[in-house]
Amino acid sequence: MLQLSIAFAADYRIERCDNLITVDPSGKRVIKVDLSIKLLTDAAIARFGQYVLSYNAQFAKVDVNSAQTVHADGSTVSVDAAQGIFDRPAPVAIAAPQFSAEHLRIVTFPALAKGDSIRLSYTLADTDTLFPGKFSVQLSFPPIEDYRSANVTLDTPDDMPVAIDARGMHQSADASRDGRRLRSYHYETPPSGPLDEQANTVAWTDIGPVFIASNFSGYAEIAHAYHIRAFDQQQQDDAIRQLAN
């Protein structure tokens, strides 16, 4: 899923951020992201010259569909898939568990200069689900960033009940066809411009535009699903008893 680091909005401009989220009956998601960011300063080049995608390798895979540097004159330089895209485990903090399935897919954009843009298309696909038949997704659009066009489309089975909170976004479509239901939402930074970074006193998911969707009916169902998944691990066996003794 898209995660943009917080930097000064004046350093860059998000020209396009499109998320197409397709969910199957098992709860597995395929998320296609198309992103274009205009880099206005050297600080933005330093920040986005290597674009980092975080994912859980135990439950998902990431494919980079295309990646390009777009120069101010319109010419493009494609990222070398062999030399410019690589994967590594996420760093593990001292206080964190030593085992982690978190991975980083790093895309290195070549020949960047002020006024250029990075253009990236990638797909995040679930290979397994934490809770069978259930899904959730959460995207945020920090109001200190300059979004010229951000779009989210959710494509689910027509008979799958889904709760959606799209605070600060405009619903642009809601239609059903061929057993699927498609809902689309749009956000762009208001004419007054992004907020100053100093205004960040709470989490952006508390005050900024968000898209949150899930087919869980509530916290009670989440707790029940967690209990079912953890049940086998809760059972005692001889090895556990010996350790306890």
Segments the model singles out, each with a brief description of its role:
Residues 94-96, 106-110, 137-142, 172-174:
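Beta-strand-rich interaction surfaces with strong enrichment in secreted/lumenal proteins
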Residues 35, 116-118, 152:
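Cysteine-centered nucleophilic/redox motifs
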Residues 8-54:
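Early extracytoplasmic/domain-onset interaction patches
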Residues 23-25, 37-43, 55-57, 122-126, ...:
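Beta-strand elements of well-folded, non-transmembrane domains
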Residues 52-86, 146-163:
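Solvent-exposed beta-hairpin/edge-strand motifs
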Residues 62-125, 131:
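A cross-kingdom signal targeting lumenal/periplasmic-facing segments of multi-pass membrane
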Residues 125-136, 142-245:
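Secretory-pathway-linked proteins and extracytosolic
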